[in-house]
Design a protein with these regions (language model features):
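A short SAM/SAH-binding and catalytic strip from SAM-dependent methyltransferases
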Residues: 112-125, 146
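Class I SAM-dependent methyltransferase SAM/SAH-binding core
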Residues: 49-104
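A short acidic, Gly/Pro-enriched loop at the edge of an enzyme's catalytic core
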Residues: 102-113
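A short glycine-rich, Lys/Arg-flanked "PGG" loop and its adjoining helix->strand segment in the class I
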Residues: 126-138
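Conserved class I S-adenosyl-L-methionine
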Residues: 143-168
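Conserved Class I S-adenosyl-L-methionine
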Residues: 23-26, 59, 164-166, 183-254
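N-terminal, positively charged/glycine-rich alpha-helical extensions of SAM-dependent methyltransferases
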Residues: 1-19
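Conserved alpha-helix/loop element of class I SAM-dependent methyltransferases that forms part
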Residues: 26-46
């Protein structure tokens, strides 16, 4: 997705490092679900080398290191502070590479490549898939979670700002030349908050703000709060926020 400012994203996530683990409720659920799917898919796979793209502070890393503790792992994240935190879960030989996963010249080959809640930030997800295919042999597994249209839809409907999320059809097209799709499953995760301001606080503390600070003025915040309550209040008076994750697993073709 063109136009994404990765330096701005890196700064946001760096600021959110200390609060992310406490606030990222949806992402934690996604990691738990993803670990279950991955365990089934890789049951007969011998994993000697593995790469995690966008490891963040290690929410998925912790599961992965327990599941594939004998593998030589490479951990990557755009944010240097995050990957340093994630590396605390390392159980064996672990290589740490911070930087833009779309620009890094990957030279090693990996039996398993995984990513949780990261590729939605990529400018060219189709090119990223081709790059991953180049560092996997036949039978290698690529497993990732990302988000579909409908994610943070409440924010977008009011502010007209947010990411343009690819559809499952987009992902199938991009994968088709390189991988056989093993799994594509999606779900909806709905969080509730006391107030619309708590929604914005949640997004800020997880680094996934859909709007920049420069967008907000006092009057805009007031208008946002009124609109959010009107449109997205639950019967108990709380307000909702929707995530629409998808889990994708595929096997490298010949």
């Amino acid at each position: 997705m063109e136009g994404i400012d990765l330096s701005h994203i890196a700064r946001r996530f760096a600021r959110a490092c200390r609060t992310y683990d406490d606030e990222a409720v949806a992402q934690q659920k996604i990691c738990r679900t993803a670990a279950g799917y991955l365990a089934e898919i890789t049951e007969s796979l011998s994993v000697n080398t593995a790469l995690e793209i966008g490891c963040g502070t290690g929410g998925f890393t912790e599961y992965l290191q327990s599941m594939f503790s004998s593998a030589i792992w490479t951990l990557n994240d755009l944010c240097e502070e995050s990957v340093a935190i994630a590396s605390r879960f390392a159980k064996g030989i672990t290589i740490v590479i911070s930087g833009d996963a779309e620009k890094i010249s990957w030279t090693s080959h990996y039996d398993l490549i995984v990513s949780a809640s990261a590729v939605q930030w990529f400018r060219r997800p189709d090119a990223w898939i081709a790059a991953m295919a180049n560092i996997q042999e036949e039978g290698g597994i690529l497993f990732f979670t990302t988000f579909l249209p409908g994610t943070l839809s409440e924010i977008r409907s009011i502010t007209s700002k947010g990411l343009d999320y690819p559809t499952t059809d987009d992902w199938r097209v991009w994968l088709a030349d390189y991988y056989d799709v093993v799994l594509i499953k999606d779900e909806e995760i709905v969080l509730t908050f006391d107030t619309p301001m708590d929604v914005l606080k949640h997004l800020k503390l997880t680094g996934v703000t859909a709007t920049g600070n420069e967008f907000w003025t006092r009057s805009k915040l007031e208008e946002f709060s009124v609109s959010y309550k009107k449109l997205y209040s639950e019967p108990d008076g709380r307000v909702k926020l929707t995530y629409h994750p998808v889990y994708i697993a595929c096997r490298r073709k010949k």
